[in-house]
C-alpha cells in the first residue's frame, strides 16, 4: 500500500520545496523503495504550456507529452521514476474535468461545490498519480495561507484521515531567517506558519527549516517545543553550493530513518555513493570551458532550468567546470557579435515569437563562420537552417512562417500533421488553439551513421522529447542539401527533419528535440557531453 508524504511551504515562496522533496525521494529510492512524486499547482491555468516563461519559468515536457511544472524536471533528475501526465495537475485542470462531468450530467443534478466535488477530484488524482509506489511525495505549490491553495490543503486533510496516520505524513518547509544585527536565527516566522497550518486541521510531522546557515540545536529544540513536532524531525537545511548535496544533508540528519520508522517500512540502508560521486565531480573539476548561451528569456534563468542543469551534468561527467555566459539575443542585435568573443562554444536554446530572432541568426553565422562548436536546440535548429539559407544559398528573404508568413523562401513552416507520443495522428492548422497543440513528448529519431550526432549517441535509433509546432520545410530541402546542409537525423517515419549539421565545421549540431529533458546528474546526456568535449578541443587548439 502506498504511503504519502505531503509537502507544503510557509512564510515565503521559493524555499526549494521541489529540491527538498526530490532529495528525500532520492534517499528513499537509494534504500530500495519504489518512489514517485506529484506536483499540485494551485493556479487556474489548465497547464503551464501557454504561460509566459518570464512568469512561470520552464515548461518541462514528460515522456508521454504532458506540459508540466519545472519541478517535475527536478524530480526526474533526482529519482529514476519517469514522470507522466498524472504527476502534475492544476486547479484549472481539476475544475475543467469537474465542469465537463457536470455538463454531461454525471452528478445527476447535484449542486457542484468545492467540498466535496473539487476535493474528491483532487484526492482521486493524487491516488491515481501515486500508482503502485511504496512512497509518493506530493508537493503543493505556493505557500500556506494562499487562498488558491485551500482546496488542495483540505483534500490533503481528508486524505490523511482516510488512509490513516501510518500511511500519511506532512512535511512543511519554512524559513528561519538569520538577523545579522542580533546575531541569531529567528523562529517566530516558523511558529506562525505552523499555527496557520494547524488552523486548517493540518499538523506537520516534519519541519524542514531553510536558512542561509545551519540552525543550532537550541533553535531546533525551541521550534520543536512550539510546533508540537519531534525534535529529531526538525531538520536544518542550509544553503548549499550545489543542490546535489541536499540528499546527503538530509540523510545525515536521519530524515529517511524517521520516515521509514514512521511508515513501518522494512528496507535496506541508503547507499548514496552515486550522489557522493556527483558532488565530488561537481566541486572538484579538472578542466574548464566558457560557453555562450544566447537566448531571449535571460531575465529569468528558470526559463532554461533543465538546459542549465544539463550543461552542468555534462561537466560532471567529464570533470569540467562549465561557465555559462548568458547573453540576450536582443543584445546581439543591438551591440553585435563582439559579445561572443573568447568563448569556447555557443549554445542557442528554444523559444517562441519574433523578438530576438535576428540576434540568434547572427549568433549562428558567427559560430559557423568562425568554426566555433555550436549546439542549437528547437528554435536553435530552425535559426541555423534560416542562417544557412540566407548566407550560403543567398536567399535573403529566407525565414520561418512563424516570423514572416509572406517569406519567399519559408525554410521553416507549421507542421500540419504528425504522430503523437502514443502513435495517434494529430492535425493542426493556424486556427488551432495554442494550448496543447504542439508536437509533444517522446518521438523516435533515426541518425545518420558517421555524423557528429551519431558519434555522440553511438546508435542509429534514439528517442527524445519534443515541444514545437514548426519544422523544416521539406519542399526546400533539396536546395539546402545541394548547398551542403547535412540532414543527419529524421523522425522515425522519415517525414520530419530532426538534426542538421553544417559542412566543413569541426562541431556544428542542431536538433529539433529537447535533449535537456532527459539529462540527469548521475548519467548526463550524450549530446551535451559531446558538445562540452568539442568545446574542450576547441579551447585546446586555441591555446
Curated annotation (Swiss-Prot):
Allosterically activated by GTP, when glutamine is the substrate; GTP has no effect on the reaction when ammonia is the substrate. The allosteric effector GTP functions by stabilizing the protein conformation that binds the tetrahedral intermediate(s) formed during glutamine hydrolysis. Inhibited by the product CTP, via allosteric rather than competitive inhibition. Pfam families: CTP_synth_N, GATase. It catalyses: UTP + L-glutamine + ATP + H2O = CTP + L-glutamate + ADP + phosphate + 2 H(+); L-glutamine + H2O = L-glutamate + NH4(+); UTP + NH4(+) + ATP = CTP + ADP + phosphate + 2 H(+). GO terms for molecular function: ATP binding; CTP synthase activity; glutaminase activity; identical protein binding; metal ion binding. The active site is at 378 (nucleophile), 514, 516. Gene3D superfamilies: 3.40.50.880, P-loop containing nucleotide triphosphate hydrolases. Mg(2+) binds at residues 71, 139. One of its GO terms (biological process) is 'de novo' CTP biosynthetic process. It is an enzyme of class 6 (ligase). Residues 290-541 form the Glutamine amidotransferase type-1 domain. UTP binds at residues 13, 186-191, 222. CTP binds at residues 13, 146-148, 186-191, 222. Its EC number is 6.3.4.2. Keywords: ATP-binding, Glutamine amidotransferase, Ligase, Magnesium, Metal-binding, Nucleotide-binding, Pyrimidine biosynthesis. Residues 1-265 are annotated as: Amidoligase domain. One of its GO terms (cellular component) is cytosol. Pathway: Pyrimidine metabolism; CTP biosynthesis via de novo pathway; CTP from UDP: step 2/2. L-glutamine binds at residues 351, 379-382, 402, 469. ATP binds at residues 14-19, 71. Catalyzes the ATP-dependent amination of UTP to CTP with either L-glutamine or ammonia as the source of nitrogen. Regulates intracellular CTP levels through interactions with the four ribonucleotide triphosphates. Homotetramer. Belongs to the CTP synthase family. CTPSs have evolved a hybrid strategy for distinguishing between UTP and CTP. The overlapping regions of the product feedback inhibitory and substrate sites recognize a common feature in both compounds, the triphosphate moiety. To differentiate isosteric substrate and product pyrimidine rings, an additional pocket far from the expected kinase/ligase catalytic site, specifically recognizes the cytosine and ribose portions of the product inhibitor. This is CTP synthase.
